[in-house]
């Protein structure tokens, strides 16, 4: 469980939330198996170890969220209640195996048939695993407008953004239900051949529909080599709240922002991820804003005569960029440097992974000795 949850966390942070919800529901549906001391202790250890292994990732995220306000909380891209589907639309799109878009996500024809069979199975005495079917129906409900997502719009669960993301888990569950074949449908060779035929033909139809529906998105080579930033990756909601994204796009080359009456700046260099320049402050102090979107960790190394010191960057209230207050004469190097929390998180992860590996090694060594003694 630890390995699986760690892998999911590294692949997609939001998926941790969804899988955790699924695990919680699974435990509730099968509470008789889980509400035992040894099982609960095993789950607690797995959860704790997962947090330790992901400390290098989770602690920096928590630090950034605590340090400043991001659009994901102040101005979210969407509210989760706005992205759920009417159940009728979900069924129609599934029957048609509609090409996937945010408004047409569906189960596909075969899995939808499996869903219908699962619902019908609830009335049969032959079917043993009715709780599993019940859990499947709860996940289906969570995708639709029947679920009260509006109550969760202003909670951390809003970061899931799109309820149809649960269709991934739902699809795996339905595939598992079909593979169990409690009705004994696939014990005959011809039914297995029919299933393979339906799967292949359904795939062919879906591919044809995909090509036909995307004709308007065909690009020339020149257009392909100059993609819009949105197609590379959006993520606007993880910008600082002060950032005006549209204004930022208009200025492809952002110079240093300062008052020439207060400070003279020369020898400006801007290689990737770094800015350096010489400065001479005319008055007591001067503020210089650099073209870096502010995140905790940007730091300036200032050289003044025979002294060298480090200074943290600050957040500008206008524009959300990183700023620096200077005095005297000197040279500045600005770049992102790992914070103490990031270093501690990395150390926790390395120690926990190393400790786990060492303990497993000792366990295997002990087992090997016991076998030799026998």
Predicted segment positions?
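Membrane-interface segments at or immediately adjacent to transmembrane helices
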Residues: 211-264
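Alpha-helical structural elements
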Residues: 52, 159, 219, 226, ...
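Proteins with a high burden of low-complexity, intrinsically disordered sequence enriched in S/T/G/P/A and R
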Residues: 1, 9, 162, 223-235, ...
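Active-site-proximal, structured, solvent-exposed surfaces of multi-pass membrane proteins
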Residues: 247-374
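Membrane-embedded transmembrane-helix bundle of lipid-linked glycan/lipid transferases
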Residues: 1-211, 331-335, 341-374
């Amino acid at each position: 469980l630890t390995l699986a949850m760690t892998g999911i966390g590294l692949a997609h942070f939001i998926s941790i939330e969804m899988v955790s919800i699924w695990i919680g529901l699974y435990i509730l549906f099968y509470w008789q198996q889980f509400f035992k001391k040894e099982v609960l202790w095993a789950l607690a250890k797995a959860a704790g170890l997962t947090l330790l292994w992901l400390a290098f990732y989770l602690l920096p995220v928590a630090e950034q969220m605590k340090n400043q306000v991001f659009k994901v909380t102040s101005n979210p891209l969407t509210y989760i209640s706005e992205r759920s589907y009417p159940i009728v639309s979900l069924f129609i799109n599934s029957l048609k195996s509609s090409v996937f878009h945010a408004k047409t996500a569906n189960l596909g024809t075969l899995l939808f048939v499996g869903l219908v069979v699962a619902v019908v199975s609830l009335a049969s005495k032959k079917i043993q695993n009715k709780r599993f079917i019940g859990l499947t129906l709860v996940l289906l409900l969570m995708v639709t407008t029947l679920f009260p997502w509006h109550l969760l719009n202003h909670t951390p669960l809003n970061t899931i953004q799109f309820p149809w993301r649960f269709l991934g888990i739902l699809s795996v569950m339905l595939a598992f239900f079909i593979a169990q074949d409690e009705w004994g449908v696939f014990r005959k060779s011809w039914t297995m051949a029919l299933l393979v035929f339906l799967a292949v033909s359904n795939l062919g139809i879906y591919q044809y529909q995909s090509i036909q529906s995307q004709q308007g998105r065909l690009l020339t080579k020149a257009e392909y080599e100059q993609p819009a930033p949105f197609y590379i990756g959006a993520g606007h909601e993880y910008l600082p709240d002060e950032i005006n994204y549209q204004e930022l796009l208009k200025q492809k080359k952002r110079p240093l922002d300062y008052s020439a009456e207060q400070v003279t700046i020369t020898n400006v260099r801007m290689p990737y991820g770094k800015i350096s320049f010489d400065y001479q402050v005319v008055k007591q102090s001067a503020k210089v804003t650099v073209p870096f979107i502010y995140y905790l960790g940007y730091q300036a190394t200032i050289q003044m005569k025979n002294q060298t010191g480090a200074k943290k960057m600050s957040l500008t209230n206008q524009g959300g960029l990183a700023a620096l207050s200077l005095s005297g004469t000197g040279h500045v190097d600005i770049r992102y440097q790992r914070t103490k929390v990031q270093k501690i998180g990395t150390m926790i992860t390395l120690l926990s992974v190393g400790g786990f590996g060492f303990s497993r090694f000792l366990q295997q060594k002990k087992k090997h000795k016991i076998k030799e003694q026998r």
